[in-house]
Amino acid sequence: MGVNKITHVAGTGPQPEAGQTVVIEYTGWLKDSSQADGKGAEFDSSIGRGDFVTQIGVGRLIRGWDEAVLKMKVGEKATLDISSDYGYGERGFHGHIPPNADLIFDVYLKGLQ
């Protein structure tokens, strides 16, 4: 299991390092294998709310994000297919993500701070 990153637009900027602050635009869906794109119900999005700014690679985020975003370059747009063990696992995220749910995220690494 783990995370599979599919790049749609290659980045040309620097790659983040663990502990660095990243600026990301994202949308997250519950994975639904019956859909052609795998995207089921949307559970979160930064679009319209403002960029997501956080440290990467320090355990603040789900493991799938930490591992995949550290392999991205600024300007890259990718889809992350994250198995539940690299997401929220058995506990899920109350009210948003059920236990053992696989996740899909569209992620745009906009910058580093």
Swiss-Prot record:
Pfam families tied to this protein? FKBP_C (PF00254)
Highest taxon of the lineage = Eukaryota
Which sequence ranges form a coiled-coil region, renumbered to this chain? none
TM helices/strands, residue ranges: none
Q: Which family does the record claim for this protein? A: Belongs to the FKBP-type PPIase family. FKBP1 subfamily.
Record-level Gene Ontology MF annotations: peptidyl-prolyl cis-trans isomerase activity
The record ties this protein, via PANTHER family, to: FK506-BINDING PROTEIN 1B, PEPTIDYL-PROLYL CIS-TRANS ISOMERASE
Q: What Gene Ontology cellular component terms go with this record?
A: cytoplasm
Q: Which residues form the PPIase FKBP-type domain?
A: 19-113
What name is this protein filed under? FK506-binding protein 1B
From which organism does this entry originate? Answer: Neurospora crassa (strain ATCC 24698 / 74-OR23-1A / CBS 708.71 / DSM 1257 / FGSC 987)
- What activates or inhibits this protein? Inhibited by both FK506 and rapamycin.
Task: Outline what the protein does.
Answer: PPIases accelerate the folding of proteins. It catalyzes the cis-trans isomerization of proline imidic peptide bonds in oligopeptides.
Q: Which UniProt keywords apply?
A: Cytoplasm, Isomerase, Rotamase
